[in-house]
From Swiss-Prot:
Gene for this chain: arnF
Entry's Gene Ontology cellular component terms: plasma membrane
Pathway: Bacterial outer membrane biogenesis; lipopolysaccharide biosynthesis
Transmembrane segments: 5-25, 50-70, 80-100, 103-123
The protein, known as: Probable 4-amino-4-deoxy-L-arabinose-phosphoundecaprenol flippase subunit ArnF
Annotated membrane topology: Multi-pass membrane protein
Cytoplasmic-facing ranges: 1-4, 71-79, 124-126
Function: Translocates 4-amino-4-deoxy-L-arabinose-phosphoundecaprenol (alpha-L-Ara4N-phosphoundecaprenol) from the cytoplasmic to the periplasmic side of the inner membrane.
This protein's UniProt keywords: Cell inner membrane, Cell membrane, Lipid A biosynthesis, Lipid biosynthesis, Lipid metabolism, Lipopolysaccharide biosynthesis, Membrane, Transmembrane, Transmembrane helix, Transport
Amino acid sequence: MKGYIWGLISVLLVTIAQLLLKWGVVNLPALNLGLHWFDIEWLWSHRHSLVAVMAGLAGYLLSMLCWLFTLKYLPLNKAYPLISLSYVFVYLMVALLPWFNETITLLKTAGVIFILYGVWLISRPE
């Protein structure tokens, strides 16, 4: 049971990280390797977006740490399908959170249902 709990925490962290990264980069101007990255005024004026991106990257790091615990307690063939749940959670969150403004379709929803069914098939007891 410990492995599934660590896996779920990892998946939730990845989901939050994806949402933060998406929000952060969408609210930044066009990304390029210009000198503006060294301009304090530019950095300060985009601090909220940059903090979101950094928090998203930190979320990925924490997720990997949790994933190591997942692998410690679960066989890989049971643990790895859990990662697919992040697709489901991200889809649900962008459907619920209006500022992402993403389209939800019947076909995409069917895909999410297939993912859930696949995770269930792989994870059930033998």
